[in-house]
A protein has these predicted regions:
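A short, conserved structural fragment
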Residues: 65-74
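Short amphipathic alpha-helical interface segments
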Residues: 2-52
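Short, intrinsically disordered low-complexity segments
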Residues: 15-17, 61, 84
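Short amphipathic alpha-helical interaction segments
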Residues: 49-65
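A generic structural signal for short, non-catalytic loop/turn and secondary-structure boundary residues
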Residues: 29-31, 64, 77
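Short, cationic-aromatic polyanion-contact patches
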Residues: 74-86
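A broad, low-specificity signal marking well-ordered, structured residues that form hydrophobic/aromatic
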Residues: 36, 70, 82
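Functionally constrained cores in energy, signaling, and assembly domains
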Residues: 23, 60, 69
């Protein structure tokens, strides 16, 4: 994962991912160079309380580990936002 600290255009241009089913479907499609926003806030703490978020973030990290996508952390208005670029 890498951190980006420029404008918030990444956030505005992203597609919101709220379910594991949606996150999984992203990788069944041909790569489109789109940005998917999957969380804003304290990811580690929030994953402990939210099983769906835990599954989504583990999927994105696993896909990034094998080179299928990039996981990006970005500060927007003092909030930490997490994205996957695929």
């Amino acid at each position: 994962m890498y951190t980006v600290n420029n404008s918030d255009s990444v956030y505005k241009d992203s597609i919101r991912v709220r379910t594991y089913e949606h996150a999984n479907a992203i990788f069944s499609e041909k790569k489109k160079s789109k940005i998917y926003h999957y969380h804003t806030g304290a990811l580690a703490a929030d994953r402990e309380r939210n099983d769906e978020l835990d599954k989504i973030s583990h999927l994105f990290y696993r896909m990034a580990d094998i080179g299928k996508c990039e996981v990006v952390q970005k500060m927007i208005n003092k909030d930490c936002c997490y994205f996957c670029r695929y």
